[in-house]
Amino acid sequence: MRPLKQATPTYSSRTADKFVVRLPEGMREQIAEVARSHHRSMNSEIIARLEQSLLQEGALQDNLGVRLDSPELSLHERELLQRFRQLTHRQQNALVALIAHDAELAQA
């Protein structure tokens, strides 16, 4: 006799974790405007921005020890890393956001 298949839990808005956030005055409208420009819901916009922020923090923490002379890096990776490190923090964030946005478009 075969064992019964167990249902794989599926993600839905009903089963998702919920968290109430108090936004400063005017921020809700700003988020709505940006979400419209990216053709996504406010929830999706907020999630995308939180994910990007968490990824950036994780990447920075994980890659603090990456050296330009590391044998793990290709020539192109060394050049990109060197140029990236020369950018201001604001420019780095903008570049990462641009790359993330392009990746989202490619997946759509």
From Swiss-Prot:
Biological process (GO), any one: negative regulation of bacterial-type flagellum-dependent cell motility
A family per Pfam: Arc
One annotated Gene Ontology cellular component of this protein: protein-DNA complex
Superkingdom, natural source: Bacteria
Coiled coil (UniProt feature): none
Disrupted gene: phenotype observed: Deletion strain produces no detectable surface pili. Also abolishes mucoidy and algD transcription.
Signal peptide (residue range): none
Assembly and oligomerization: Forms homotetramers (via C-terminus).
Annotated protein name in UniProt: Transcription factor AmrZ
Source organism (scientific name): Pseudomonas aeruginosa (strain ATCC 15692 / DSM 22644 / CIP 104116 / JCM 14847 / LMG 12228 / 1C / PRS 101 / PAO1)
